[in-house]
Structure formats: structure tokens, C-alpha cells
Amino acid sequence: MKEDSNTDTSLPLSPKHEEGLNNKVLIPLVWQTSLLFLLWVMFCWQGLVTVVDIWWGNEIFNHGFFIVPGAFYLIYLQRKRLLTTPIKPSLLSLIVIIPSVFLYVIGIAGDIRLFMHLATFTLLPSLIWMLLGTQASRVILFPLCFMLFSVPVGEQLIPYLQEIAADGSVALLKLTGIPLYRSGLYIEIPQGRFLVAEACSGVSFFIASFVIGSLYAYLNLNSATRRTSFVLISLI
């Protein structure tokens, strides 16, 4: 009697064998990512030096030190899914990499820090996308996007948030019946004259809520709608 050649007689892999296969994929990937990270640091050195200066000197952006390490930890949490996903380098990422390089060069030439910082933290996730490929990058899409929180942006909102805070203060004072006079960001009442300062704008709270709210939603909620709703509520 002839044995059916299509019959699968292979035995399931032992845990040690499976771990060995995973290491064959994981170890080269770690080395490649480390090399890519080193090249990124070398190319974006000037942008990194200036952004660290802002992180250190402005308490609004102190969180910047933790964003990239946190993003890599989130990627580490997805390692099992990554190992079961085809990893194939993708040139599609060049549609982001090339403009980012040009933006970085323009930022250096014109000493425009915002351009340098935006390009720096757009290049890193884009290079990882190029290394892993589109399919694998979808598995870690949030950690890659999370890296953009490293960009120290938000101070531009301070004047607008100061106006909102002043409007809110005036509205509350009117409800109490206290006589007042407002001139720009200054509010005068019988007890004295007060300024709605930058610290009253709430920009630190706004940025922190955005970062923490996004992270919490990613880790604890599954639906895209729920995640978006939670982040929006956290900003209020």
C-alpha cells in the first residue's frame, strides 16, 4: 500500500527549537535596528543636541527624554507578533524619508529648529519602517507615531490658551457679581490687578494629557473609536 505523499508527518516544534528559530530572526533584527539607530544619531546629531537643550531647559518638554525609549519598549512588547509577521524591507518609506532629509537640511541651513526637530523624529520611525517593511510596521504603528511626541512643539498655543483662560476667569467673576475691568490679559477687581500669565495657560497640562491619554488609550482600549474619544476627553 502506497503512502500518501501529501500527509504531514512533521512533529510540532519543541519550545527550545521554537525559541531557537525566534532568536535567528530576532538577533539579526536587533543588530540591524541598532546600526540604523546609530546612523540616525550621527546624521541628526545637530537636531538631537538642540532638542535635548530644549527638553532640559523647558519644563513643558521634560517628557521628551522618555518618548523614544518608551516607544522602543512598546515595540518590545509586540515582539511576538513581529516574529510571526513577514519582515521585508520596503522602499515605500522613501516617500517620507526623502522629504524629511530635505526638511532637515533646510532646518540646518536656516537655523530653523522646528524643521530640524520635526525631521529628526520623522526620520527615525520612517527608517524603522524601511527596515521592517509595511506589513510589520503596521503591527507597531502606534509606537512609531508615538515618537513624534518628542518634537518640542506647543508653545505656540500659549497666547491662545491665555486668552481662553482670561475669558473663562472673566465669565466666572461676572457670575459672582464682582465688578471688574479687563485690558488684554490683565483683569482688575477691587482687590487688585491680576495678569493671566503663561503658567496659567495650561499648555503643560494640555501636552501631558495628550501624551499620557494617547498612551493609556493604546494600552487599555481596543476600538479605534474608543481610543480617539478617550484622547479627546483627556484634553478637556
What are these regions (language model features)?
Residues 2-236:
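Hydrophobic N-terminal alpha-helices or hydrophobic patches in metabolic proteins across all domains
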